[in-house]
Swiss-Prot record:
GO biological process, one term: glutamate biosynthetic process
Organism this protein belongs to: Shewanella amazonensis (strain ATCC BAA-1098 / SB2B)
Organism classification: Bacteria, Pseudomonadati, Pseudomonadota, Gammaproteobacteria, Alteromonadales
Listed Pfam families: Glutaminase
Enzyme class: hydrolase
Subunit structure: Homotetramer.
The protein's name in its UniProt record: Glutaminase
Length: 304
């Protein structure tokens, strides 16, 4: 059974790892974050949230936003419309690879690498008059926190360093798999990545993935079938090139971001968010992964 004392104990056990790994520095706004932060929050499907460490401090969620984007697309499109434009397979290349996009004729491997997330952002742009505002509404609804907001400094910083993502988008456009103005989609995409949320916010927002698509306020966000498929994609492709290692050590569907956050799901039971900014070689939170590994061991839970 999950108790406050367990979370406190796990955070204490993992603290000695702080200082190992490296904070993401290719986005200047992220490079300024202390590597000594560590937090965890767990929300059960009945709405109870427990946390320890820096669990209420907001951070840049970065690629964790790709879960919200894909969920938003599933709310707007038939699945065949999505999966005709993006694949469902692990990548095996870096998350911002141009080579793979070229070799596979503009169809990204999955929605959680940059190319795939840009296609999803393009889909949202096609159906929404104000995609940035709609995304904010979705995230605020899911997290039950109407103060969640974009970090303009982070969004602007990413836009100023957007050459590679722009190249990916234009390459996909050359293959006919990008329909809107590249600059407009990039601005929306960087805003999604700049969402500032705490472990508490994210653990609450992701409850629908643990509860057959039903959010904390009782609304069906996506169907039970769509939820299973989302979790399957998270299990195979949610942790960059570290997805196999994460499945082996933690055994939960998950999604990481270079801001140091990781969300993980125990279907039918709970959603978890950990945060520690220093990353391992795969770009995943080093201390955060260990924290989730210990939690899985203590609870005796895995999807496998």
């Amino acid at each position: 059974m999950l108790e406050q004392a367990l979370l406190d104990d796990l955070v204490a056990k993992v603290r000695p790892l702080l200082g190992q790994g490296k904070v993401a520095d290719y986005i200047p706004a992220l490079a300024r974050v202390s590597p000594y932060k560590l937090g965890i929050a767990v929300t059960t499907i009945d709405g109870t949230t427990l946390g320890a460490g820096d669990w209420q401090e907001a951070f840049s969620i970065q690629s964790i936003s790709k879960v919200f984007s894909l969920t938003g697309a599933m709310m707007l499109y038939e699945e065949r419309e999505i999966w005709s434009r993006v694949g469902k397979e692990p990548s095996g290349h870096s998350f911002n690879s141009l080579v793979q996009v070229e070799l596979e004729r503009g169809i990204p491997r999955n929605p959680f690498i940059n190319a795939g997330a840009l296609v999803i952002a393009d889909l949202l742009q096609s159906r929404l008059g104000a995609p940035k505002q709609r995304m904010l509404e979705i995230v605020r609804m899911l997290s039950q926190n109407h103060k969640v907001c974009y970090d303009k400094v982070v969004a602007d910083s990413e836009y100023q360093h957007s050459a590679r993502n722009a190249a990916i988008a234009f390459l996909m456009k050359s293959f006919g798999n990008f329909h809107n103005d590249v600059d407009k989609v990039l601005r929306s995409y960087f805003h999604y990545c700049s969402l500032s949320m705490s472990c508490a916010d994210l653990s609450r927002a992701m409850v629908y993935l643990a509860n057959q698509g039903v959010s904390l306020d009782g609304n069906e966000v996506v169907s039970p079938t769509q939820t299973r498929r989302l979790n399957a994609l998270l299990a195979t492709s949610g942790l960059y090139d570290g997805a196999g290692e994460f499945a082996y050590r933690v055994g939960m569907p998950g999604k990481s971001g270079v801001g140091g956050g990781i969300i993980a799901v125990i279907p039918g039971d709970m959603s978890v968010c950990v945060w520690s900014p220093a990353l391992d070689a795969s770009g995943n939170s080093l201390a955060g992964t260990r924290l989730l590994e210990l939690l899985a061991q203590e609870l005796g839970r895995s999807i496998f």
